[in-house]
């Protein structure tokens, strides 16, 4: 039997569990003379929370790779799948196609002993765009919204690109803090009314604040009735949070930062609470040898209510820049540094590793490095995986076959490196670039 490579799984656990609780993501490249061939399978461990960093230049297969991991989780056996949940933050609207089978790569799938099939993903669209999407036939399943009450003055100032010490930022902070002190909940209209009713501030500052919050109403993502986290995070469910409506909106990235930062913060808080309950249960079972069936069933149901979460972020450098910060930075750095213990795994993809926060790379225990050509990017990647390289990263990447999906996998848990090929997707990939020349289908001959 071929030796199975499981990225992120310690040798003792590999011998104990084999490939149980892992997903196939590709095959290992081996060099035989002048020939490069695909050898043993490479899996990704799901038994523990990992941080997976995926990088590569445009078109090298980063988003495709994220889809492969999400597919793998969605097709695990029920017992394992029910204890995991995927939240995929889709900034460009390319992952809804996972609902449909990959018929365009049927020949390639056959070579891997696979067949095309769709994944029952659940697509969340901002409330203000949900009805429009339904009317226009754009795939969506559930409206998504967040509560303005959950945002701090700093969140608003980062979103509006304001210096916290300038008069307008100070005024907005005063309004928001006053509302938080006086009310248990409020919406954007309440903020507008509070600004209009304020008698202390100068008129030009009030108008500047009003203009900003009037534009917020057009974002269509705020509501008193926020989407419950339990709807977004369900055992066995792949949730796609479609933020593509903001791709062409002025300041669209600021809105995405705000939404993702809040989702990440809520995830961390909820999983911390659940993790404490899980630890208490472990202590209880260690002390009390006899556990009733009712207690076992209660624990199983609790695990389904808030499973281990795999948070997947495309274009991660936009949310975690190397210089400065966004409304998502603090929450995401907290997950990177502390998310393992409460049970939050992350997959981050970027085409510019030279422009991403260093924590995104240094906190990663699995790295999938696709082809890179820009020196700033190869230098950034080479600095964190240099100890695994025989030469330079440029040289190692050059040795890879020039096909999409080829990459270098770095397993920091076992301190090993493998050249590999990502497996083909069995659901449709929506991230390909449009072409002006299309392949014509041949007519059937009888």
Where are these regions (language model features)?
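Conserved beta-strand position immediately N-terminal to the Walker
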Residues: 52, 239, 347
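Flexible loop/turn segments at secondary-structure boundaries
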Residues: 61-62, 94-96, 130-131, 248-250, ...
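Basic- and hydrophobic-enriched, low-structure N-terminal and domain-boundary segments
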Residues: 1-59, 64-83, 104, 116, ...
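Conserved P-loop NTPase motor module
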Residues: 402-446
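Conserved ATP-driven motor cores of ASCE-family P-loop NTPases powering translocation/secretion/packaging/pilus
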Residues: 7, 71, 335-418
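P-loop NTPase motor domains
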Residues: 48-49, 68-334, 399-413
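Alpha-helix N-cap/helix-initiation motif
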Residues: 55, 59-62, 66, 249-257, ...
């Amino acid at each position: 039997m071929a030796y199975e490579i499981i990225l992120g799984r310690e040798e003792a656990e590999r011998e104990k569990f084999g490939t149980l609780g892992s997903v196939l993501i590709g095959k290992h490249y081996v060099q035989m003379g002048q020939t490069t061939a695909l050898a043993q399978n490479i899996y990704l461990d799901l038994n523990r929370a990992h941080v997976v960093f995926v990088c590569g230049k445009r078109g090298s297969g980063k988003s495709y790779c994220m889809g492969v991991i999400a597919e793998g989780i969605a097709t695990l056996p029920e017992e394992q799948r029910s204890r995991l949940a995927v939240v995929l933050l889709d900034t460009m609207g390319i992952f809804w196609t996972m609902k449909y089978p990959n018929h365009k790569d049927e020949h390639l799938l056959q070579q891997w002993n696979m067949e095309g099939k769709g994944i029952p993903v659940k697509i969340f669209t901002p409330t203000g765009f949900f009805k429009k999407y339904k009317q226009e036939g754009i795939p969506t399943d559930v409206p998504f919204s967040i509560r303005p009450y959950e945002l701090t003055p700093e969140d608003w100032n980062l979103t509006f690109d304001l210096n916290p010490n300038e008069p307008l930022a100070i005024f907005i902070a005063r309004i928001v803090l006053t509302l938080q002190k006086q009310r248990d909940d409020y919406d954007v209209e309440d903020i507008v009314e509070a600004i209009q009713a304020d008698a202390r501030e100068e008129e030009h500052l009030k108008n500047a604040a009003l203009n900003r919050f009037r534009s917020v109403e057009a974002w269509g993502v705020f509501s008193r009735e926020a989407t419950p986290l339990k709807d977004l995070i369900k055992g066995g469910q792949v949730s796609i949070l479609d933020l593509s409506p903001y791709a062409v909106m002025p300041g669209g990235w600021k809105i995405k930062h705000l939404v993702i930062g809040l989702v990440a913060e809520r995830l961390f808080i909820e999983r911390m609470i659940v993790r404490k309950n899980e630890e208490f249960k472990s202590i209880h079972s260690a002390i009390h040898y006899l556990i009733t069936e009712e207690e076992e069933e209660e624990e199983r149901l609790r695990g389904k209510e808030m499973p281990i979460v795999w948070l997947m972020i495309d274009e991660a450098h936009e949310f975690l820049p190397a210089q400065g910060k966004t409304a998502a930075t603090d929450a995401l750095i907290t997950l990177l540094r502390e998310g393992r213990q409460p049970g939050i795994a992350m997959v981050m993809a970027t085409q510019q590793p030279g422009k991403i926060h260093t924590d995104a790379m240094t906190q990663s225990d699995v790295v999938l490095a696709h082809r890179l050509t820009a020196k700033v990017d190869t230098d950034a990647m080479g600095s964190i995986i240099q100890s695994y390289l025989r030469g330079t990263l440029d040289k190692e990447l050059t040795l890879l076959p020039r096909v999409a999906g080829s990459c270098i996998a770095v397993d920091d848990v076992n301190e090993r490196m493998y050249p590999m090929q990502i497996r083909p997707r069995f659901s449709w990939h929506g991230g390909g670039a449009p072409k002006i020349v299309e392949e014509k289908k041949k007519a059937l001959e009888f």
